[in-house]
Amino acid sequence: MSVAASIYLPQFTIGETAFDGFKNEMGKFGNRVAVIHGERAWKASSQYILPALEKAELSVTGTVLYGHEATHRNAERITEDPCVREADMLLAVGGGKCLDTVKLAADHLGKPVFTIPTIASNCAPITKISIMYHEDGSFCDIPRLAQVPVHCFIDPRVILEAPVCYFRAGIGDAMAKFVESQWSAKAGERLDYGSELGITSGSMCFYPMLRDGEKALHDLEKKQVTEELENVILNIVISPGIVSVSVHPHYNGGIAHALFYGLTSRKHIEENHLHGEVVSYGTLVSLMLDKDFEKLSNVYEFHQAIGL
């Protein structure tokens, strides 16, 4: 008898009217929402989010600063907050560390969580894992969660307010997802459906970046919402997330991220380099070890062009 397998694919909305979907998506779970956010993230996005919540007739039980690091203690503190306990659902607003912290808190509480990424730098807005750190910023562990976030809302105007360095690093992180999953599946064993789906989808993290990445970066610098910019945002946030939630854990990682976890145990690297910057170096190492010199050359030239 076969073993049951489930895949929960992410749902998302992107566009300057993305928050108009609050009522349809969040209203299914009640009308009380606690907003947990990063400090800079809230300053950049609250002008769009609060009116949209009011328009959707959703009552905000409170706004809570998540902390400054994705730690288990911060997740516990969120679960203990009265406005969070009172809420029907949680809305996480911020970067990857904020979203992972809120996702873990929601998992502990058994409450639905919605996400609004304010930077395009990783797939945390839609995955069912949380990458957690110690108070000093060193890597701790990766708890697996019961569910993916219910819905991810992406307003590109919010992404435009973030420093360009996060977007650049996000491109590097996404491209690693394709290289790592391809490498991990090289043993030749028959893939289960989910793994084949995820690894095939992983090409969206790579080839469109080579095509659109440089222009999208320039568009971001000029604060212009373009088709290329939105495509790259989706291929940073959504495409690698589809890989993550679909593939068997054996294929969800590789040399690039292993190097990241090792290198960031060095304080000067953890403090001075973004996740995607370190991972992009690991991508080059992975391609070198794989002797895929054509991809190595293409990726190296692309990294040089965008400043990775």
Sequence positions of predicted segments:
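ATP/NTP phosphate-donor binding region
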Residues: M1-D88
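A short, small-residue-rich loop immediately preceding and capping a beta-strand
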Residues: P82-A105, L109-T118
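A glycine/threonine-rich phosphate-anchoring loop and its flanking beta-alpha core
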Residues: P10, H108-S201
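Solvent-exposed alpha-helices and their adjacent loops that cap or buttress functional pockets
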Residues: A4-S6, K28, P82-R85, A106, ...
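Short glycine/serine/threonine-rich phosphate/pyrophosphate-binding segments
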Residues: W42-S46, K97-K103, C123-I126, N252
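C-terminal charged capping/lid subdomain of soluble metabolic enzymes
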Residues: V3-I7, A18, D292-L308
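Active-site segments that bind and position negatively charged phosphate/pyrophosphate groups
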Residues: D192-Y300, Q304
